A protein has these predicted regions:
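Beta-rich, blade/repeat-based domains predominating
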Residues: 1-9, 39-51, 57, 83-95, ...
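A short beta-strand motif characteristic of beta-propeller blades
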Residues: 31-37, 75-84, 121-123, 128-134
Length: 171
């Protein structure tokens, strides 16, 4: 099934979870114009871009760099803290020169330096889950979108009945 999306150069790039390939669509017609196979990464979880290249997560600690023209993986960095690697990187967003990555089954979003993989901060969204309607199918934090005009982040989760717009403030 479909996973991460990113828009770059009038194209929509979409990942598939376990099918080992991505899809490319024309941003205006929404027609599929291309497919691409994953390289060393085996799954597709999250996708973002910096205006030049694409960054892809596969559920591991790696962030893969994709060339938007050839769609080849051209390297990677490992996300890490001073205690070790940070695994289960999921949905990605590019925010002011950093990669925001939620971690599967966690309530936080890591702020990652894309040049070296260093985790520079973690945003704790645990309190948001207390504001959604409780039900048996309620699941994890698992969706983000950044609005550069308002500098806000939209955050939600699987089977959540609310979408939160938050502004990140540094202390």
């Amino acid at each position: 099934f479909g996973e991460g999306l990113s828009v770059l150069n009038d194209k929509i790039y979409q990942l598939t979870w376990r099918e080992g390939r991505g899809l490319v669509y024309d941003v205006n017609s929404l027609e599929q114009i291309e497919t691409f196979n994953y390289g060393q990464s085996k799954e597709g979880w999250g996708l973002c871009n910096d205006g030049k290249k694409l960054y892809k997560s596969d559920g591991s600690e790696f962030l893969w760099f994709l060339n938007p023209i050839t769609l080849a993986e051209e390297g990677s960095v490992q996300a890490y803290t001073n205690k070790g690697k940070l695994t289960n990187l999921n949905e990605l967003e590019w925010v002011d020169g950093k990669i925001y990555a939620n971690r599967y089954q966690k309530n936080g979003v890591a702020i990652i330096n894309p040049n070296n993989g260093a985790i520079e901060a973690v945003i704790d969204f645990k309190a948001l889950k207390t504001k959604v309607t409780k039900h048996q199918g309620l699941d994890v934090l698992n969706g983000m979108a950044y609005n550069p005009q308002t500098k806000t982040l939209f955050v939600t989760g699987k089977r959540w009945d609310k979408l939160f717009e938050v502004r990140i403030i540094e202390n």
